[in-house]
A protein has these predicted regions:
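C-terminal accessory nucleic-acid interaction domains of nucleic acid-metabolism proteins
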Residues: 14-131
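Short, conserved phosphate-binding/catalytic loop or strand-edge motifs used
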Residues: 1-5
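A generic structural motif
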Residues: 7-13
Length: 131
């Protein structure tokens, strides 16, 4: 699952990456049984990888509506927050069922994406929950 949030255009690549690293490190420190911020597959087994490296200039990520090179031909599908559920797994949308998804929607779930633009928070990842 890639979480995408629109930032005000004044945010610079290095500060966005640093903020996302702080958030990833904070999440993995607060809930080490659930999250990890290191790429090592051995360290992330059974955990959710918070991959802050996708936020670096030149980093790649799968494009919306792209077919993945995996069994069943899953498709990268933009969703609204309201559509998220535990039933939607990485292979939920495929080249077989995407046409019926399009037929059952009113349009692009990201149509108003830019309306949610916000500045990069200055304290991201610094506020830690108490244990």
């Amino acid at each position: 699952l890639h979480v995408v949030a629109p930032l005000k255009p004044k945010a610079q690549w290095p500060e966005v990456k640093a903020a996302m690293k702080a958030l990833a490190d904070s999440m993995s420190a607060d809930s080490p049984d659930d999250y990890v911020s290191t790429i090592s597959k051995a360290k992330r087994k059974g955990k959710i990888l918070i991959d802050y490296l996708r936020n670096g200039r030149g980093a790649t990520a799968v494009a919306p509506y792209s077919t993945r090179a995996r069994p069943g031909a899953p498709v990268s599908m933009p969703l609204s927050f309201e559509e998220l559920s535990p039933a939607i797994l990485p292979n939920h949308f495929t080249v077989e069922n995407v046409p019926s998804r399009f037929a059952g929607t009113d349009g692009d779930p990201w149509e108003d994406f830019r309306k949610a633009e916000a500045p990069l928070p200055s304290k991201l990842g610094k506020v830690r929950k108490s244990r």
